[in-house]
Amino acid sequence: HVVCRRQRQMCIRDSHYTYAFLGDGCLMEGISHEACSFAGTHKLNKLICFYDQNGISIDGKIDNWFTDDTAKRFEAYNWHVVEIDGHDFQQINKAIELAKSETSRPTIICCKTKIGFGSPAKEGTSNVHGSPLGDEEILSTRKNLKWEFNKFEVPSSVYKDFDFKVQGQILEDNWQIIVDEYSAKHPDLYKDFKRQVAGQLPKDYERKFTEFVDKISVDDEKIA
């Protein structure tokens, strides 16, 4: 369930966000219209999408086959639209906070980016779309970005920023408190929640499905 069933005051189903990462090629496909229109119609405010808007596909610049105004398109779907510089970390963080504050619409964060950022010869071209830079261009890119570390060396400052063990344990402990309280107050819903997480169908699914098939097989009503 995307929104808390029966609007319980405490609901572990509704305490998370779903993040998706999209590219120009993704939004060209027809299925994107169906899915995004559905999300907007049903006000799935826990859905946050990052659109990597670099204007490049594997066949080159998209100008000749994809000229949609994506921001207006998603506004028409009833989405919350945030446009940012996709290389600006502060803008990214602020956009995520704005998305989380939205309570009635899904959010798309349009990140204007340059594919192959930092590569002197291949930045902004389809040559870096799924293809390696090559040894010479790697050296040029490292020099251009002033990256002085050796191959496969991760700076200690990066390790520090990504070390989420302590904070992660705190969040896990807080989450467990919520789960315990929820399971005590709503044991039936919690049991159903665990079933869904385990990917299991309800015990009466087969019976209900058979009854449904039997009904429509003898019903005169035409179903498309």
Per-region residue spans from a language model:
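Conserved acidic/glycine
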Residues: H16, L22, C26-G30, I48-F50, ...
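Conserved catalytic motifs of the protein kinase core domain
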Residues: Q7, S15-Y17, K46
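A structural signal for short coil/turn segments at secondary-structure junctions
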Residues: R13, H42-K43, E102-T103
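His/Asp/Glu-rich metal-coordinating catalytic cores
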Residues: H33
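Hydrophobic/aromatic ligand-binding patch that stacks against planar heteroaromatic rings
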Residues: V2, F38, R73
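Single conserved hydrophobic/aromatic residue that forms the stacking wall/gate
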Residues: H1-I12
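Boundary/activation segment at the start of structured domains
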Residues: G40-I48
